[in-house]
Amino acid sequence: MAETMQVSAQRAWTHLKKYQPLIHELVSRDLKVKYRRSFLGYIWSILNPLLMMLLQSIIFSYMFRNDIPNFPLYLICGNTLFTFFNETTSMGLTSVIQNAPLIKKVYIPKFIFPISQAVSRFVTMLFSFGAVLLVMIFTRATFYWTIFLSWLPLVLLFFFSCGLGLLLSALAVYFRI
């Protein structure tokens, strides 16, 4: 069984490298479609987390008398990461079913679609971290050198969300959720 698993993993890695241009095109298409009819375009990736943080900050700070220092920064970091996880898993869930016409026409490994959704959401999350930096500057939060290590948990979250999206997409095809 371990040999079968290894061959399967090698084949998946080979397909991933082979279809990398397709993943790039799917991510590019997804980002263009997401902001196509928007007046502000990609600025929404920064503006949306800021507006959510502002609203939640007002509600939790003033209505509930919450006096946590740098509370808006905690809110925007948590919201950005949760939004990434939520969108990656929910879009990964339906990605294979939505691309069924393409899958029926030509051979494409089905795992390409949830992975492209995860990469697309990761790029959007990286744009959203511009809003996090703005909040850090605005709230005068202390910058530590450990901020340069923040990429590691982001990569781990990406792989976890991508794996969960792959699992959910397989279940969605099987159970037609």
Please give the residue ranges for each predicted region.
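Hydrophobic transmembrane alpha-helices and immediately adjacent juxtamembrane helices
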Residues: 1-176
